[in-house]
Curated annotation (Swiss-Prot):
Listed GO MF terms: endonuclease activity; metal ion binding
Protein name (Swiss-Prot/TrEMBL): Probable endonuclease LCL3
Active site: residue positions: R108, E116, R156
Organism: Scheffersomyces stipitis (strain ATCC 58785 / CBS 6054 / NBRC 10063 / NRRL Y-11545) (Yeast)
Binding site for Ca(2+): D113
Top EC group: hydrolase
Length: 235
């Protein structure tokens, strides 16, 4: 029996431009879907979900402030994709503390140190309550964007926090320093400023000249770092 002649015009090689184009399209779609899922679908629940890549890329995270615990830190419920992914209308943010357990990141504001509150029977610094009240009113129960830099020894995510106000997006650390309710972070290790260190120092100098907040204390003013060294030595 004679062999059936092959029609070379119907053969398609794996290296055919159409095959290569289709393969490239499938690969690109899969990659973009993966990146979209990572950035806009996957929730980061605790510091254990923060990868080195997220820190290296300073990947912006959008979420809701569930609680302000101190003058320079707060609890953050990650809501990837925001309202476009249903947060706030289709997907509810828990309000019960038990429901929020292991579901939030502790954010430590970068570049700023607020006056120390009373802990373990130790005295509170002047303006510590004012700083807490200010931060609570500024970001509490609001959506913010955080830019992560590192994780500190207390498992907090050190980050820049930004919140929308009527006058635009505000850097929370900068606004706290502007009000004299925090000073530029003075620790020699673990300091994170992003690209705003010069701005923070200029705002601090202005608040000091205007005697705002802690700077109204004059020579009685003690920095949070000095206060901790004096009252928490050996703890």
């Amino acid at each position: 029996m004679a062999p059936i002649p092959q029609n070379s015009s119907t053969e398609v090689s794996l290296l055919h431009p159409k095959v290569l184009l289709l393969s490239a399209g499938i690969t690109t779609t899969a990659f973009l879907s993966y990146k979209f899922h990572q950035r806009y679908v996957t929730r980061l629940r605790t510091y254990l979900d923060i990868t080195p890549k997220i820190l290296d890329n300073q990947q912006k995270l959008y979420g809701y402030v569930t609680r302000v615990g101190d003058g320079d830190n707060f609890r953050f419920f990650h809501t990837p994709g925001g309202v476009f992914m249903g947060w706030g209308w289709l997907r509810k943010i828990p309000t019960n503390r038990n429901q929020l357990k292991d579901e939030t990141l502790m954010i430590r504001l970068c570049g700023v140190d607020a006056p120390e509150r009373s802990h373990w029977g130790k005295p509170a610094q002047p303006f510590s309550e004012e700083a807490l009240i200010w931060l609570s009113s500024y970001v509490g129960k609001r959506y913010v964007t955080v830019t992560p830099f590192s994780i500190d020894q207390y498992k907090r995510l050190v980050a820049r926090a930004q919140v929308w106000k009527w006058t635009g997006k505000k850097d929370v650390s900068a606004e706290m320093i502007r009000q004299g309710l925090g000073i530029v972070y003075e620790g020699k290790s673990g300091a994170e400023f992003g690209d705003n260190e010069a701005l923070y120092r200029n705002l601090e100098a202005k608040a000091k000249r205007q005697k705002k907040g802690v700077w109204s204390l004059g020579k009685k003013m003690t920095t949070p770092g000095e206060f901790k060294r004096e009252h928490y030595r050996g703890d």
